[in-house]
Amino acid sequence: MAVNPLDFLKNMSNFKDNIDNIKKEISQIVVCGRAGSDVVVVEMNGEFVVKKILIKEDFFNDLDNEALEHMIKSAFNDAVFKVKEEIKSKTMGSIPFGI
């Protein structure tokens, strides 16, 4: 079976369009990582940039530094996990063979 080089180039163009669409979708992802029953919430975009950190005021004074650091770290890690899951769900059908 002969492979037509023009078909290959056409497919490469479609692949590039798919990649561009995926990049656009990823840039629009926004997730919230949470810790301590929403005492700490980290908002992160699809490029893993933290956009916001919210700490419930009524708990802020009651937490020691170590507990607060732990909750921020947990919320951040939760957000990273959620971004990765969103990226995976948006890209698995768009990239051939699940690459």
UniProtKB/Swiss-Prot annotation:
Q: Which GO terms describe its molecular function?
A: DNA binding
Superkingdom per UniProt: Bacteria
The answer to keyword Mitochondrion applying to this record is no
Quote the Gene3D superfamilies the UniProt record gives: Nucleoid-associated protein YbaB-like domain
- For this UniProt record, give its keywords in alphabetical order, as a comma-separated list: Cytoplasm, DNA-binding
Q: Which GO terms describe its cellular component?
A: bacterial nucleoid; cytoplasm
Q: Does the keyword DNA-binding apply?
A: yes
Matches recorded under NCBIfam families: DNA_YbaB_EbfC
Q: How does it assemble?
A: Homodimer.
Its biological function?
Answer: Binds to DNA and alters its conformation. May be involved in regulation of gene expression, nucleoid organization and DNA protection.
* Protein's name according to its UniProt entry: Nucleoid-associated protein EbfC
Q: Which organism is it from?
A: Borrelia duttonii (strain Ly)
